[in-house]
Amino acid sequence: MTQPLMTMRGIVKTFSGVKALDGIDLTIAPGECVGLCGENGAGKSTLMKVLSGVYPWGTWDGEIIWEGAPLKAASVRDTERAGIIIIHQELMLVPELSVAENIFLGNEITLPGGRMNYAAMYQRADELLRELGISGINAAQPVMNYGGGHQQLIEIAKALNKRAKLLILDEPSSSLTASEISILLDIVRDLKRRGVACVYISHKLDEVAAVCDTISVIRDGRHVATEPMRALTTDRIISLMVGREIKNLFPREPHPIGDVIFEARHVTCFDVTNPRRKRVNDVSFALRRGEILGVAGLVGAGRTELMQAIFGAYPGVSEATVVMEGKPLKIRAPVDAIRAGIGMVPEDRKRHGIVPGLSVGHNITLAVLGRFASAGRIDSAAELDTIHTEMKRLSVRAAHPMLSIASLSGGNQQKAVLTRMLLTNPKVLILDEPTRGVDVGAKYEIYKLIFQLAQRGMSIVMVSSELPEVLGISDRVLVIGEGELRGDFVNDGLTQEDILSAAIRPVQRSPNPTVASAA
């Protein structure tokens, strides 16, 4: 039997008297890929921060055995020297530096006298990229010239340059296209063949199944199960993660669909850096009361820019006529949209959704503070009462509402941003990638909420890159391709192939869809 490369035993980590990890065990062998699964807030990232030295030895209880000896790392530097490398969900690259400079950051090759040996670094960086089978990256170019997919691969090259024996990948595909994900999974398989162990953290269970040998599930800070991947089904993994059986991930509920309530006409957006280039070109669509409208398309198609323009949040020049209940609106900024009954939960919650310096509660009430103001003062008791009520209603899990929102899991941050928008009582709610980076349990709760809102007569626009999600939730689907409307389909027998075909080619399957009700 192969000797373990790393063993964690009885790991306990406490924050303010609350156990975030409660006696967790984890073992991994050379060349093995372990999928670490669990809901947001289950303790996955905390466990990996213990392993990678972010939380140094002495700040947690238990033991880590590395290559047969106790590991007592005082810092990330110590674990990296040992060969344990973590690639975080938020990449740690310096955009202005070259690819090679990023790969060698902190481990630079120098000439006598201490000057940088750029020629040697460029050569070695090119070798690393070739070893990984990565093409299309020039080691001398700044990292900011490359998209998220290439940057993820640069991070892996950086890890290999540090002679990684154990590579921890935390949600590595959250911002990648389908083709980039395929390249990533091939690289993980190649690393396994070389004897590099991997811990793969992802909510995308198809990826976990594709590359992982073993699945380890944690729930509420406790180890639930470790089983071979071949013995598990997706439904079984979900059940272990959430502690209950979810038979239908998309809990469709009948909801009546009324007359047209909202129209966006001739929406056009110009590129921020190149004002001659159109990111969105003359897109028009209508939305009915109680309707769930999915918006699909390839990455970079202009879906987010379309929604930002409607909401008054597009950073560049945009043109649009927005009509609510037959009345044209003047939307110059998001505050105008909110006052008119339009709410939006943005794609990038960390940059445009949450305010990291504020508490969970203050993030929730940020858009409606005027409700609690009297004579220039805030009625804190009334505000706190609303916060408690709304957090309970949407199952926003936090030890206390006055904790920093930055301390919450991604799923709970998303629900807090959603709660804030719902407090504005929108008639139309735009959700841009509402389940990105959240676990299966949180996704299910968000889907249930979407159907509940539709039942109450709210109209929903949901942008998503996950086609099963679009098909499972939507009454109607818009397809955007290269900034243009490529299709407007009733979701009745619609397939992923139909959507992709429309995204690639301007094919109109149902030019004038009408929907009376959804079941």
From Swiss-Prot:
PANTHER family: CARBOHYDRATE TRANSPORT ATP-BINDING PROTEIN MG119-RELATED, XYLOSE IMPORT ATP-BINDING PROTEIN XYLG. Part of the ABC transporter complex XylFGH involved in xylose import. Responsible for energy coupling to the transport system. The keyword Transport applies. This is Xylose import ATP-binding protein XylG. It is found in: Cell inner membrane. NCBIfam families: PRK13549.1, xylG. It is an enzyme of class 7 (translocase). Transmembrane segments: none annotated. GO terms for cellular component: plasma membrane. Pfam families: ABC_tran (PF00005). It is a peripheral membrane protein. Its EC number is 7.5.2.10. One of its GO terms (molecular function) is ABC-type D-xylose transporter activity. Keywords: ATP-binding, Cell inner membrane, Cell membrane, Membrane, Nucleotide-binding, Repeat, Sugar transport, Translocase, Transport. Belongs to the ABC transporter superfamily. Xylose importer (TC 3.A.1.2.4) family. The complex is composed of two ATP-binding proteins (XylG), two transmembrane proteins (XylH) and a solute-binding protein (XylF). Residues 6-245, 262-507 form the ABC transporter domain. Its main location: membrane. It catalyses: D-xylose(out) + ATP + H2O = D-xylose(in) + ADP + phosphate + H(+). CDD domains: ABC_Carb_Monos_I, ABC_Carb_Monos_II. ATP binds at residues 38-45. Gene3D superfamilies: P-loop containing nucleotide triphosphate hydrolases (3.40.50.300).
